[in-house]
Amino acid sequence: MPGGAGAARLCLLAFALQPLRPRAAREPGWTRGSEEGSPKLQHELIIPQWKTSESPVREKHPLKAELRVMAEGRELILDLEKNEQLFAPSYTETHYTSSGNPQTTTRKLEDHCFYHGTVRETELSSVTLSTCRGIRGLITVSSNLSYVIEPLPDSKGQHLIYRSEHLKPPPGNCGFEHSKPTTRDWALQFTQQTKKRPRRMKREDLNSMKYVELYLVADYLEFQKNRRDQDATKHKLIEIANYVDKFYRSLNIRIALVGLEVWTHGNMCEVSENPYSTLWSFLSWRRKLLAQKYHDNAQLITGMSFHGTTIGLAPLMAMCSVYQSGGVNMDHSENAIGVAATMAHEMGHNFGMTHDSADCCSASAADGGCIMAAATGHPFPKVFNGCNRRELDRYLQSGGGMCLSNMPDTRMLYGGRRCGNGYLEDGEECDCGEEEECNNPCCNASNCTLRPGAECAHGSCCHQCKLLAPGTLCREQARQCDLPEFCTGKSPHCPTNFYQMDGTPCEGGQAYCYNGMCLTYQEQCQQLWGPGARPAPDLCFEKVNVAGDTFGNCGKDMNGEHRKCNMRDAKCGKIQCQSSEARPLESNAVPIDTTIIMNGRQIQCRGTHVYRGPEEEGDMLDPGLVMTGTKCGYNHICFEGQCRNTSFFETEGCGKKCNGHGVCNNNQNCHCLPGWAPPFCNTPGHGGSIDSGPMPPESVGPVVAGVLVAILVLAVLMLMYYCCRQNNKLGQLKPSALPSKLRQQFSCPFRVSQNSGTGHANPTFKLQTPQGKRKVINTPEILRKPSQPPPRPPPDYLRGGSPPAPLPAHLSRAARNSPGPGSQIERTESSRRPPPSRPIPPAPNCIVSQDFSRPRPPQKALPANPVPGRRSLPRPGGASPLRPPGAGPQQSRPLAALAPKVSPREALKVKAGTRGLQGGRCRVEKTKQFMLLVVWTELPEQKPRAKHSCFLVPA
């Protein structure tokens, strides 16, 4: 049943049914009464004095005026200014005929009679008056002194003025026990934003002015209470709205009436003494009204007396909701300020405000206290406080109040057109206020025209007197369910704030958008229990909430009794969580633990219960209920305490017309993805919607940057490849063909395998240390003249069989390093070149790669037996192993040569220390350039041969 809506979280403001009306004085002078033993002024008869600032032609309701009144012997000078923003341009008035047909009229653009102002030379003062039928209103001098002024009945020009505390009603209360401050802090957790939100509202967005387009309704009993006078009834409702607008200005919120309706021939919905049934009946009627008259919030003023002390009822956090943005208020006072305080309180609940704790309100109880106090002040509260401001900010940050950013169009503002009033109206190009206060460089204040060259003067889509280009972002997407808005290029104002339609999936399909918010069980559990909490299994909800008692229920019914949850609605009752914390975050809340058996193991289900007074138990629903808009199953959402199919949102039907390329906004129009054009997202375009403006074209900057980077990388790779090819070609030339300074600088591209199993002809050729790393041998370079022919091997190189076997490593090393004359390399002074004039540059650091490929076949046919098999040669005693038997004294000469057209792979044929054929041998010496120079050593008795096999190889 709708009356038990768990997520609505209703708060009731309880006051007295009827205050004591101050007794009017029939004679001029003072009327005193006794209160607490001391005489005090009850009321005073005065005649206010008007002084206008207009031209000599006197207006009935001037734009600005000065009013002088006497109060307790003190003259108060009131500086008044007409509240020109009270009525929206679409303001209408509706009444009904005896047959029940509505009659709607648009009020003429006449001077209205509702003012705001201050007391001259008095800080923090405030004045709210109407001058339609005499002067009636509230004069606030300080936080503890205020006066009420009203016309004396049946008198011309005479008025009563008295202190506001003499309107004191019997005290009432609502909701929480406001003496416990922590209760409020816990309730605030419900309006905090989840940590996963992509983006929070900017501070300037929170501080910017918000606008509530209000629709007021007076029921049939209220009409009868005002003596069936339509004008009197309408005047009272407008006066109420004027008060509420003044109250909310301190929160940067303006109240603009878009419509007023009087039920002159019976009620249009069920109105009874039960506030619950009256509220849900009125909200149901209001949903039908939305199709005919757009508004943000609707309030019912009824002459019905509710049960007990209840005089107001409204859902919590419901502002802008299609289904719940509204409230019902009982007219419990003949003075409009009493009903205005009640309506401001109930609208505060719509804004997400809970009741004040004891330390929030600084206004004295004697002057009424604060509007959101749980108990009434004396006589009526008139101010909000810092706690209310913080609650409002949290609500806006969580996604609430999405409809409040758009300012009502003031081009046909009710109350008349005038250059200098600060509102752009028909016939005006701009309006920056009076000449002395205008500081807009784009606007001529004297005649409300744009200065030469200016295209605009106001609005977020106007920059330096020029309209911003179409597609310029003027309002960012604040959170998941919000939508961005873009300048149209035709208007200086940003389009109305739109958001995704209720029922649109969010949070990766784990939740649904509702009223601009995306709520999950996980978030609510963490708000109740702190970080780490998570929702309990579904079985916990089913076992606990079917009880229908204080600890497990689906809200309350029309009579205020706890309602059992049907199995399908169990996840919309008391929320069940799992947490390791000992108790909930709120000090007045206690854990309600239930243990169930699931799959053979125990599961702990943790709910919460907040202790409240007996009078509060029936006035406010449990805040531990699952919030409206929470996903309770596939295509199902919690709504009014029930798990309902999302089809009633009509999201699916609206989404089909977007052709899968967009989402529906709250105006049921498609907001297209980039690349598709509105209104149906079925043709190429830039995205956006007909409501939010066109999205900017996709920027080609990233594409161009990507192409340029790719071209640059490709060019670098090609340059590196070209350099390597050139190095390979230069490295394969003879050293004799290169300048001496460049011979060894191009040897880096040669590859040397570090693997003994490479498949070379001589697998014993290794350039590795025992640790598997190449060992660099540094020996002086052996130089020869460029004209000197390459050495030849001895003529008998190929005779006599194989060369002698190589020596063991330690003997070979000893023989090479022996200082004896037989091991020295002969050099002559004539063969030496002069030392270089400058040191030889170091070899470049080149990467030496491995080559595991098979060697190339020889380019020339090899002889039949180029290397005969080895045979042991006799060694006479004392003969050097490097000399053949019978040789004379050793007179060897070193010869270094690089075979023509030799490849790096062929250079590996020779191993350092290998004995040469017919007594010759190849050996390795170090050079200064870290190269291995394979040197052919010839014996003196042998003739050099034309061919050789010793090569210059890389280190």
Curated annotation (Swiss-Prot):
Cellular component GO terms held in the UniProt record: collagen-containing extracellular matrix; nucleus; plasma membrane
Motif (SH3-binding): 833-844
Cytoplasmic side: 721-955
CDD domains found in the cross-reference section: ZnMc_adamalysin_II_like (cd04269)
Induction section of the entry: By 1,25(OH)2VD3 in monocytes.
One Gene Ontology term from the biological process aspect of the record: protein processing
Documented EC number(s): 3.4.24.-
PROSITE patterns: ADAM_MEPRO, DISINTEGRIN_1, DISINTEGRIN_2, EGF_2, EGF_3, ZINC_PROTEASE
UniProt-annotated glycosylation sites, renumbered to this chain: 144, 444, 447, 645
Residues in compartment: Extracellular: 203-699
Pro residues bias locations: 787-796, 833-844
Effect caused by changing residue 609 to Q: In a pancreatic ductal adenocarcinoma sample; somatic mutation
Function: Participates in the proteolytic processing of beta-type neuregulin isoforms which are involved in neurogenesis and synaptogenesis, suggesting a regulatory role in glial cell. Also cleaves alpha-2 macroglobulin. May be involved in osteoblast differentiation and/or osteoblast activity in bone.
Name of the protein this chain belongs to: Disintegrin and metalloproteinase domain-containing protein 19
